[in-house]
């Protein structure tokens, strides 16, 4: 059938087009909604039982978190529920009995060593820092002398001597290097590493958010550069990635040099294991950055001759973006949704890591088994027969027991992270693919971006939920195998070389499958947008189109996608460099590389969302060109532009073959991916119908 407009040709095309658009993969949308309802239930419990400030600031023996205005009131503990906003530091009554000692929140740590009650009173008068129990009348110290009933590890005042201290992680740690001080650091080092990790993220969330915002600006700048400098953008990105990788590598080695050789290291922090962990982490990252930098430089050197061929590809994609300025809306919306989700996810993970329920503990040595801890009764924690609060000598204190079942929900949220991030990416890819396909096969004056987003929300959320779940299925086993391989190589028992080789092969196989499925999804979304069919049939149609042009597909995806990957590396490297500069000297962090790693990962996600705009435009245009060439031959729209180079042919010269009446940016006469379907219940006409 020819391409000229005729009633017969138009009628045949209309008969081949799907007349009705209906919802696709609705079952998968229901599954995704149920999964998210489960995540919300977990989040509610984590917000109720989790409190990161309990780990960061510490809490006293009465259940009050230091440095907090509102604390929960426990019946039977008159000193609970206090406003400790002006008391950010945690003070132990006896450093020799840390596990038994009463602990309170104070305004500041003792600035001098004290050995008498009168010195405590004088220090209170000068600084306003009360080192005795909250309800103790400090004026009684004038007559208390050095009575052991007053000054002991149970209070109401601390045992002597009260050592000069400095705050370390909001805990008053005596100055010096003696055995007592070492015991204090042993207690700090016994904290859960995961709790320290999330505590550092919580403390630096504003810096993480700021650097992620900068990553967004850098990504937008790269997209703008691709639009206006399409002919040389490949070279610019290669130069930028070399500069950024070299700068990040130098910064990491410089940070490692400072940690290892810096004179006058603060001995208060050098006794913490986190100091060593930072040094090891920086060294590891520096080595990895060096290896990555060398690999990137070598690969860029060998691909330099193929970069020139990408100019036509990026130029045509830039032309598409000029005609469709609304394409930038989809990545920006995806960015906002991703930031909102990641913020929610981090908040829930922090609360899950610190989730605990209040319990009462006797004044007796306790250990990590928590066998002595009892959950707090619903109506009362401790009931005293004493009518005088000042005479209250507690035989129990508030301790928070880990909520083990709730913490185990962490792994559900790991799956939720992968699936939801992939779902956000898939929604963006679908909107972009649909908009570009509508632009290619319809009039150039239309701006179909909002139209494509509307169709996605109204009809095709189930399809993107299914597509993102398929990727999740292959990604999770790969991550598990990668973790097992790392543990195997790190452990003393390295295992057999055969087992290690099998793990490597499995990891590589899952990685290849994931990449293949991701690429197939890109093209399947284009077919779904046009044909309004389910995911699996659409993937089959897209695969057939790609299989007939396998050489061109390999070239575009090997070189073009590598350049876009380099753009993402530029954003992640620059963001990591900024994060190191801002965080390396920030006090109070257990493990400052933790937020730096989070910054790099989040920045790469952000760059992936923004820069995948070009990737989707290129892949969609190529799929449209393949189908246009198959159906219309040299009379199709593809032959009139640089798109012809994508399939190994030269574009038609002016006057070489006069185009027919509606060739330029008008609907082609044959329906791409045409599938005859019966009318559905929804009478809305599919987007490919003629105007």
UniProtKB/Swiss-Prot annotation:
Organism phylogeny: Eukaryota, Metazoa, Ecdysozoa, Arthropoda, Hexapoda
Amino acid composition bias (Basic and acidic residues), ranges on this chain: 1-10
A GO molecular function held by the record: transmembrane transporter activity
Positions annotated as glycosylated: 261, 385
Domain of life: Eukaryota
Topology in the lipid bilayer: Multi-pass membrane protein
Keywords: Glycoprotein, Membrane, Transmembrane, Transmembrane helix
Annotated family: Belongs to the CTL (choline transporter-like) family.
Cellular-component GO terms for this entry: membrane
Name of this chain's protein: Choline transporter-like 1
Alphabetized InterPro entries for the sequence: Choline_transptr-like
Location of the protein in the cell: Membrane
UniProt-listed GO biological process terms: transmembrane transport
Residues spanning the membrane: 28-48, 205-225, 232-252, 282-302, 332-352, 408-428, 527-547, 562-582, 591-611
Region (Disordered): 1-20
Gene source species: Drosophila melanogaster (Fruit fly)
Major place of residence: membrane
């Amino acid at each position: 059938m020819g391409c000229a407009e005729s009633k017969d040709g138009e009628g045949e095309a209309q008969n081949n087009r799907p007349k009705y658009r209906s919802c696709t993969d609705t079952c998968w949308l229901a599954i995704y909604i149920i999964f998210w309802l489960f995540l919300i239930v977990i989040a509610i419990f984590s917000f109720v039982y989790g409190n990161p400030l309990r780990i960061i600031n510490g809490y006293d023996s009465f259940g009050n978190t230091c440095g907090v205005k509102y604390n929960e009131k426990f019946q039977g503990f008159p000193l609970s529920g206090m406003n400790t906003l002006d008391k950010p530091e945690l003070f132990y009554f006896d450093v020799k009995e840390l596990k038994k000692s009463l602990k309170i929140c104070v305004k500041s740590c003792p600035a001098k060593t004290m050995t008498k009650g009168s010195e405590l009173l004088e220090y209170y008068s000068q600084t306003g820092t009360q080192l005795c129990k909250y309800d103790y009348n400090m004026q009684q110290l004038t007559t208390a002398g050095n009575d052991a009933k007053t000054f002991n590890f149970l209070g109401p005042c601390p045992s002597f001597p009260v050592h000069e201290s400095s705050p370390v992680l909001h805990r008053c740690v005596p100055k010096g290097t003696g055995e007592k001080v070492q015991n204090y650091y042993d207690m700090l080092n016994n904290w859960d590493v995961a709790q320290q990790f999330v505590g550092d993220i919580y403390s630096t969330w504003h810096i993480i958010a700021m650097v992620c915002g900068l990553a967004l600006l850098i990504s937008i700048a790269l997209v703008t550069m691709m639009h206006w400098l399409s002919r040389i953008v490949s070279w610019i990105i290669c130069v930028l990635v070399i500069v950024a990788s070299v700068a990040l590598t130098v910064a990491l080695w410089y940070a490692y040099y400072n940690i290892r050789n810096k004179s006058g290291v603060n001995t208060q922090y050098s006794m913490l294991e986190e100091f060593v962990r930072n040094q090891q982490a920086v060294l590891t990252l520096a080595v990895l950055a060096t290896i990555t930098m060398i690999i990137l430089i070598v690969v860029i050197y060998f691909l330099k001759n193929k970069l020139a061929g990408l100019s036509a590809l990026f130029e045509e994609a830039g032309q598409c973006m000029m005609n469709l300025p609304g394409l930038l809306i989809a990545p920006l919306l995806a960015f906002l949704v991703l930031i909102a989700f990641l913020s929610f996810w981090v908040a829930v993970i922090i609360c899950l890591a610190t989730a605990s329920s209040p319990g009462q503990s006797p004044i007796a040595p306790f250990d990590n088994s928590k066998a002595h801890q009892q959950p707090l009764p619903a109506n009362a924690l401790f009931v005293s027969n004493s009518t005088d609060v000042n005479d209250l000598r507690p035989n129990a204190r508030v301790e928070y027991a880990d909520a083990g079942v709730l913490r185990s929900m962490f792994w559900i949220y790991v799956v939720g992270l992968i699936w939801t991030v992939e779902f956000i990416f898939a929604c963006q890819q679908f909107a972009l693919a649909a908009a570009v396909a509508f632009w290619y096969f319809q009039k150039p004056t239309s701006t179909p971006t909002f139209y494509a987003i509307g169709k996605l929300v109204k009809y095709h959320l189930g399809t993107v939920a299914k597509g993102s779940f398929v990727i999740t299925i292959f990604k999770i086993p790969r991550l598990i195998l990668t973790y097992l391989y790392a543990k195997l190589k790190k452990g003393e028992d390295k295992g057999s070389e055969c087992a290690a080789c099998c793990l490597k092969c499995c990891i590589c196989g899952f990685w290849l499958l994931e990449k293949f499925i991701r690429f197939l999804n890109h093209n399947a979304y284009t077919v779904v947008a046009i044909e309004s069919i389910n995911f699996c049939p659409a993937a089959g149609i897209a695969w057939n189109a790609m299989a007939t042009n396998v050489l061109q597909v390999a070239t575009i995806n090997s070189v073009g996608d590598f350049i876009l990957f380099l753009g993402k590396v530029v954003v992640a490297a620059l963001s990591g460099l900024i994060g190191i500069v801002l965080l390396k000297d920030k006090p109070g962090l257990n493990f400052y590389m933790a937020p730096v790693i989070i910054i790099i990962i989040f920045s790469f996600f952000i760059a992936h969302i923004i820069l995948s705009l070009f990737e989707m435009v290129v892949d969609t245009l190529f799929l449209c060109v393949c189908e246009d060439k198959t159906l219309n031959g040299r009379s199709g729209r593809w032959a009139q532009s640089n798109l012809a180079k994508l399939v190994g042919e030269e574009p038609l010269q002016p006057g070489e073959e006069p185009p027919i009446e509606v060739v330029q940016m008008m609907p082609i006469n044959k329906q791409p991916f045409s599938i005859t379907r019966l009318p559905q219940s929804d009478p809305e006409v599919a987007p490919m119908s003629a105007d």
